[in-house]
């Protein structure tokens, strides 16, 4: 991606390597100029998949054959699968890739590729195994409350060190990142490295330390990275940082981290090593679990349904029927597994399989433990961080589709779970509930759950009960006026 290309091209180590980066904002004419002035040198073009067409156009303009004269290397080729669901153009160069005389794909965390052209062209898999012990220790912090677990993890790290080390946090959600920084009062001491749109989004919240390109001088005590920086970027620090990965499946499923690819890549960013690795995660038993065979069976069935509907579309007798069948075709699941020409997109299919298998890891803590235990790159240790109220309760409280009455029922249920609120953590939870609905929290503190339920959550009746309770305990002289105001609306 762009940060990697810019980083490589600007690296002093490569100043004599004749590198040329191609991405958004670099045009065909720029590539032509580079090719013309590099006639007696090796061409070394680094391009995003989305900009590959500009490289092709430049070669064609100069009547040169890139297929014959160049070696095409797909670096970090696991991204062809991992990003296929949201970067539709990442596979654009793949048809050209198979036309090159000399070509290869490389990755430290490869994923099985099922495109039949690999077999047709007799591709070989070459695996390089280190001769040294490369396993790293990782702590899995299982929790029902990612915010509080993150806070406690930071507190532990800060208390253990005389000279604080950088803390690098990988979360694929700028919404979660901003929430963590704000709630834990880290805004002044944090930097965020993310996509340009996310930089703008954070800017609208008055946060100015957000960047689309990484550089060491932009780092702070706490450094947050989204998926744009999970792979290939070289982070060379004099100190060995603490690495924290965070997954919140309740807030955003796309924060799931794959132990076999994502986790390895994140740790691999730090060329001089790390001090510790922690993965904080909740789990969600509602996530469907499927075997690889079941997932493939679903794809086969989806394909047959698509073919049947496509046949109806092709045989439709009139325009109205064709429009109806076209709409049906576009809504079918298999439609997402086709390229722009209507052919099977094998990388989209591989992506679906990979994503569905990854969901299995987050069904329960045992599944995630097993995934890390089976990964050759880590030695995992587990620790539980469980609290009175967690992410599931937050999700239920923040559900915008529920009625006010249902929301208040949920808040009362959570107040019951909290009890007397003796710890600072419990007081924080209660402040969150007050922010969500101060009336029902005050009502609970004044008249209690039983009275609220007897009055069937009627705001008018609960308010009367609160006034009467306060009068019986300590009269202020204003109770009658308050009761009248509660019973009548001005102007009616």
Regions found by a protein language model. Give the residues of each.
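Conserved strand-helix element at the start of the C-terminal RecA-like helicase core
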Residues: 1-9, 45-49, 153-185
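Conserved Walker A/P-loop ATP-binding site and its immediately adjacent core
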Residues: 1-27, 49-53, 111-114, 173-175
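SF2 helicase motor core recognition
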Residues: 34, 51-64, 107, 216, ...
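SF2 helicase catalytic motif II
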Residues: 48-52, 60-104
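Interdomain hinge/linker at the junction between the two RecA-like core domains of SF2 helicases
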Residues: 108-156
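Conserved helicase ATPase core of P-loop NTP-dependent helicases/translocases
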Residues: 198-226
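Conserved SF2 helicase motif VI
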Residues: 250-277
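The feature captures the C-terminal accessory region of ATP-dependent helicases
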Residues: 297-492
